[in-house]
């Protein structure tokens, strides 16, 4: 049952990340699974015989977080002026493009076969291999993410997100830099999603495109729309 709990914690972490763009900023992102994949494949490439680098776990987390943030900004820039259904369609397409690219880059990602024999996650000599050890790692990360996002929600940036969610034109009219606020939402959300991907890959010690399908993306969105309408506290519950 610990494996089931671990799966739930990963979805909670993903929900916390996606809630930034959907719940706080009111931006319907249907391609969030792409950032999840970026994190997972960052770990898959840097902690396996695939590139034979075998970097330390924490270093990979940092690299994956940066990769996720950059990917989030790259997605955010072309969709800045899109809203509603148009935004949803473009982000959905982005998520599918990432999956298709991963699926077809056999020479790097292993294609449909994925990447196996990933290194064990280890911090300061402590290995996280058994489900109960992964559970504690996930719990710490989820709590940290929840606290950070809660602080952001009550910051000036969080108030800017709320204003954009209520009325983007009015927010711009009162002097809020909506471009910067939106990019910050995408970047922060993508960073958390990417970190979730790293832990997922480390816990499975295997990663493949099948874990990042459209259905997975929709499931994460449903978690936000149904389970966590706006409040971060509901996401944790």
Predicted regions located by residue number:
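Transmembrane alpha-helices and adjacent helix-loop boundaries
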Residues: 1-237
């Amino acid at each position: 049952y610990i494996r089931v709990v671990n799966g739930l914690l990963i979805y909670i972490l993903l929900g916390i990340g996606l809630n930034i763009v959907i719940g706080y900023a009111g931006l319907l992102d249907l391609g969030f699974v792409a950032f999840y994949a970026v994190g997972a494949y960052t770990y898959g490439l840097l902690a396996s015989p695939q590139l034979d680098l075998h970097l330390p776990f924490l270093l990979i987390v940092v690299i994956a977080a940066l990769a996720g943030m950059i990917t989030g900004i790259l997605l955010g820039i072309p969709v800045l002026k899109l809203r509603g259904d148009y935004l949803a369609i473009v982000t959905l397409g982005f998520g599918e493009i990432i999956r298709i690219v991963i699926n077809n880059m056999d020479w790097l990602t292993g294609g449909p076969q994925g990447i196996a024999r990933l290194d064990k996650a280890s911090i300061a000599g402590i290995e996280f291999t058994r489900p109960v050890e992964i559970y504690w790692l996930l719990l710490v990360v989820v709590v940290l993410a929840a606290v950070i996002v809660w602080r952001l929600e009550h910051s000036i940036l969080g108030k800017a997100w709320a204003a954009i969610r209520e009325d983007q034109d009015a927010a711009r009219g009162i002097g809020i830099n909506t471009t910067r606020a939106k990019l910050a939402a995408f970047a922060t959300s993508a960073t958390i999603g990417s970190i979730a991907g790293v832990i997922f890959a480390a816990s499975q010690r295997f990663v493949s495109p099948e874990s990042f399908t459209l259905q997975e993306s929709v499931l994460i969105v449903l978690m936000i729309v149904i389970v966590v309408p706006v409040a971060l506290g509901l996401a944790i519950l």
